[in-house]
């Protein structure tokens, strides 16, 4: 072994060897164990959340492989419709082109080209994390095999009456020109206004006041709602109001949705542009009035004609034109064609001129913003495709979506067939499914799975694998030519099929990739369904987890996975959400490889366009990382993630903690070197009677206990606990204690004890390497290669070794009790040395008093080891009643362990030093107490700063107590 641990050289070497050897592929032996990688966007790069989640999955896969399971970690990437299309459109924009300049086929071809050039970035970064995934089976959601599964699911659901096309309210991105899912919408707090507007009754005798943050949508109002029990407005229900600035009249309706105690108790109802209003409109049969075109401009402008592009057929375009004309007739001409925000300004001014603007006041808004374009999302009535998830029975008597799709997915969790970890997330899952809406699955994009539907000239729909299949399965003959729907499917539609489509469904035989390599075979690979556990974030329980359960249950009759482990979200050391604009994001590869300050600043500010934000981020980075980020290596990063992986919703990543686990790796490396340096040449056989010494039997007992704990923690997904157990055993018991306890035997004259100790050192080290391997695979493999020949092991890699089972190790409780007593005595001596500032190298006298017969027997047995390891003279007993010298003492049970102080320290100097230190700490405590006693500080400082100050007081008081006790001992 090299003298020092150098992660970079080791990591690249071993990953390439593992992958080339086929070590990541299913063995074909043992019970199946499968984990599905949540497919990252093909556009993406590895972030801290990915690295954390993939470390958890990799630990599980490596652990189960060592336990003899037939493991498959199924990986792949998602085509990420909107994100990928946006990247290529941005490239075209730099060339002063649009996708329409290229045309659909040429644009899609260009996206494929970009994918081939850049799509492997994130998978190569996953390799850097050590992901032991079967890359030979890597899939892409636009692969032909997966595309075939998508088409079959769409066609089967459509023919079962479970997919329909309808005019519904959706999240509309007016910049991208497509519907988007809730997950692609961020609610951003912004400063805005609340406008209070007076609506007069039609007879002009009375009025009501309505408050709104979007006065422009008033043009689409169809009613004003009040609570049924609100006596103030009971007499107005059923009467009509004049809609300001228009010649329309709208009714006053009563609905329980209204909170009569909020504001004026009157709510304007705009069903075409608000989700809650849409539901109210449905209940009261109010026809929505759409006032916007698809560019979020008031209807009546020159770009309205472009909106016909989203109509699927000439007949539908005609219908849309009639609907737009009807809406347009209700909009005053002066607002037509205006951008929504221009219209807002003009409408507010006109309301003020008309004397109908009662009040304007500042208001904090939660604005829905598109994740991809930064445009403000507009609720919009458009024609889209939907999966029915809410009806019990269809008109023709067939089961509706709730019965056929939703309820089986609910039952899978309620019955315990699928379990969530932590368990409370099952409530989130069931609550969402209990209140589910039909799923909008169409997107107005070019990149994605094109919807397999065609329209004739009369607007009739034909669905099939292709046009010929659609015609063959048509109930009626098409009128004229057929034209395929221009829309593509929601990315989540193909992702919902991931558990079984990646295994080869629905193909009858082997599925091959573009290189002709077999990547799946349903008949063989369905043994991996259900997978063992899904590791994912809580933010996609609705969008992905539930939909996988729905689709998998419907098409295979099986659940997709047995357990769902919901991992935490990674935040910075202060608990703040990581974001580029805050300057607190970390690139996992920068932690692994290290990065100097200037490249780090340049990298972190590269995409920040606002000068003030860029300056703020640069200042923070220079403060937080004055010397850049040191390289800690993959293993230390993985250990950090494992140690943080609790059941909490968030984890705080502190680079200092990661540096601590780099020190752990160094400690393990040096311990292995110590063991190997104390071995003779050749294989080390187990001597007869081994283990001979109590120290050996103690370390083996503790190893057994630790392995048992680790196995339980793997089962319960308490990665933080298993990391702690492995850390404490390796650092404290193996390195700090057993290596020390072994020295007397290794250096003594008892050849049998020396041989036995050498063998036990090897056995324990090799077992620890196996136990640590799922967490820190690179360093353990490198060390194991030097250890294996000494034990006569013939495997090529640590990955081929079995998990070290606790039940294979014998425990010796008696030996453990003896060594624990011995450790306590040594710890007492060392604590006194530390407290009294006595050099560890200085030999000191050791006195013992009190105790019982067992203590005397143990002292006699361990006298030489105590003197050797504690650097003391031979222990001397002070008999009862004898005078005792001034001494510092530690207590072990009833035994007193004493170090006489005479001649060891300058009592006067030590008293002075202690007095100064006590005074200094008292001052620090007063400072902290002063801050916390300041009400303004407590009220205005960040919560984490207040917590830190309180913790400082606790820590200072602990230290102060210890120092005062030392001073008392000195008299």
Identify the role of each PLM range:
Residues 4, 13, 17-21, 89-207, ...:
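Residue patterns forming the tRNA-binding/recognition surfaces of aminoacyl-tRNA synthetases
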Residues 197-199, 239-245:
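Short conserved beta-strand and strand-loop elements enriched in small hydrophobics
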Residues 1-28, 971:
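Generic start-of-chain signal for non-secretory N-termini
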